[in-house]
């Protein structure tokens, strides 16, 4: 890489910290709304409490100083980490004190996990199911037990110490959040030093993180899991530190430990192949990925990330400059290319957050799919309720993060975008042909919606008329997903060329053998047919509509033909003032509001598809002579090709467990199912009525209070249009997710 003379004179990185930046004042914090001159005056109307919640974390509205905003975000991150460590501590504390972890560890196939016991008050102890191993408790589906097994935890005492460690880390994070805001607050230059941040995050956070994790797996998790797999009782296994300090003990399990570090320094790395493996496939004892493969994977990643963490130029005048990379990134048809993006990403945290949320959301969705296709932890693949829970969980998180990415992209456009600094770069060029983008995307949505839904309407009609031979199905007019089948086949065959020494395929979802653990199917080839082709096009439709709404909100955040001065109205506004009809629901906030409904649609179809497909074609039992019996007997291919089939054979048929749960350990799910339906229906009251109706009602109620001489000091006000939509949306999503959660879990627990 070429180094210019100006780069050679790059000034050394200094430590940019301001001492005693902000006074620690409990008296100030005790005043509600202290961050806003208007809110600090106290409530005059009930709108005050809404504005308090809306603006508490909107640091942009509290100060115009980018440095102050940066410090607040940085400090808030430590608060977030404190909450996460506290949550982790709580999970481990429950595992240590209220769980059947030891019993589960001794027989993970037939004993269910539980880490919560309900107290016998008003008869609610009925929720304590008999999960096996002489334990009654609420069956949990979080996957913690399987993860603890993979980490090499063999007793509740170890969980207890981790819980204490989590508490200490939580307290440390709280202290760090206070210290780096009040005592030693970083200056703006520190936050904007992209190269140093990249080096430290890549080499430190990811590189050393992966290295320490692979170190833990090699020295502690691998030997303990090898003994557990061999049937050694947990209480007979040496304590973790003994594997760390006793090389002889390790060498009994992995002979290459006898050779020490000599093979490492002489380049004979193949000597370590007894614990750094490349087997592929799943461990037949546990149904999870080979732990030695996982250790190898993290070691390789750590090397890559540590290398990557030395790529960027800081004190030593060598390495990449982020600004130069971006400004050099231009082609013959892209104008100024990425010029101006460096300034955007170092002055707008909304722009950076938008990218990070979109990436993390996508990553969460990728994780959801890897969790079942390549189950990472021992015995997780045969715990169907946990598999369904984790898939649903990661899909929801992915959906919310992607929508959040669009939200902050739009906030960036409204608050931080400067057109003069972005002339003819890629962002400007996208904005200038936004009409072409959105109109084409709209056409794609109409095409996908009409055709994918049309296939189902056709099938329902043909089935209703008794003409099965004219339906789109594997037995009549076939619509085979030939490209998906081709991709599956490539992935099945590829390891033969790319990893010739691997023992098995990357994932049995692509093809290969049936992996079973204790007579239950962990993973097997997932055959795709007409039913999958049809529902995948529904996925394409719902995702494209979500993208259409969100992208329109970003691209038209500053202006549109309807509202040319939209940037002046801000991110969130109900309508463009009185006298301008037809301008409501056009703010960027409203696009996020509408996008969330379609995100809900998208994720619902995905998790319904997954739940039914796995029960129909993967999950089930296998006899010693190879006879497979799936939970719903392979009915997905013939039933899911009609809308009636989805309603009758999935929603109604599989809702029987939650509907009939009263009087059983699953009865809480029956109550949640009912309550969540109510919360969902309650949302419609906010979504289908206007502010004026409620204001009139409130004024009549206030009149009655005045008549009786107990009128409130704080004047009641109806929710604003935006507030009403926010409350409606929150209840719609909460009700919908609660309904799906209870429906899935009552069903999954009964089939696990």
From Swiss-Prot:
Top-level EC class as recorded in UniProt: oxidoreductase
Organism: Trieres chinensis (Marine centric diatom)
HAMAP family xrefs: PSI_PsaA (MF_00458)
Binding residues for chlorophyll a': 677
Name of the encoding gene: psaA
Subcellular location(s) per record: Plastid, Chloroplast thylakoid membrane
NCBIfam families named in the record: psaA (TIGR01335)
GO biological process, one term: photosynthesis
Family: Belongs to the PsaA/PsaB family.
Function recorded in the entry: PsaA and PsaB bind P700, the primary electron donor of photosystem I (PSI), as well as the electron acceptors A0, A1 and FX. PSI is a plastocyanin/cytochrome c6-ferredoxin oxidoreductase, converting photonic excitation into a charge separation, which transfers an electron from the donor P700 chlorophyll pair to the spectroscopically characterized acceptors A0, A1, FX, FA and FB in turn. Oxidized P700 is reduced on the lumenal side of the thylakoid membrane by plastocyanin or cytochrome c6.
Bilayer topology term: Multi-pass membrane protein
Binding site for phylloquinone: 694
Identification of the protein by name: Photosystem I P700 chlorophyll a apoprotein A1
Reactions catalysed, as given in the entry: reduced [plastocyanin] + hnu + oxidized [2Fe-2S]-[ferredoxin] = oxidized [plastocyanin] + reduced [2Fe-2S]-[ferredoxin]
Oligomeric and partner information: The PsaA/B heterodimer binds the P700 chlorophyll special pair and subsequent electron acceptors. PSI consists of a core antenna complex that captures photons, and an electron transfer chain that converts photonic excitation into a charge separation. The eukaryotic PSI reaction center is composed of at least 11 subunits.
Residue sites binding chlorophyll a per the record: 685, 693
Cofactor binding remark: P700 is a chlorophyll a/chlorophyll a' dimer, A0 is one or more chlorophyll a, A1 is one or both phylloquinones and FX is a shared 4Fe-4S iron-sulfur center.
Binding residues for [4Fe-4S] cluster: 575, 584
InterPro entries linked: PSI_PsaA (IPR006243), PSI_PsaA/B (IPR001280), PSI_PsaA/B_CS (IPR020586), PSI_PsaA/B_sf (IPR036408)
One Gene Ontology term, aspect cellular component: photosystem I
TM region positions: 73-96, 159-182, 198-222, 294-312, 349-372, 388-414, 436-458, 533-551, 591-612, 666-688, 726-746
Gene Ontology terms, MF aspect: 4 iron, 4 sulfur cluster binding; chlorophyll binding; electron transfer activity; magnesium ion binding; oxidoreductase activity
Record EC number: 1.97.1.12
Keywords tagged on the record: 4Fe-4S, Chlorophyll, Chloroplast, Chromophore, Electron transport, Iron, Iron-sulfur, Magnesium, Membrane, Metal-binding, Oxidoreductase, Photosynthesis, Photosystem I, Plastid, Thylakoid, Transmembrane, Transmembrane helix, Transport
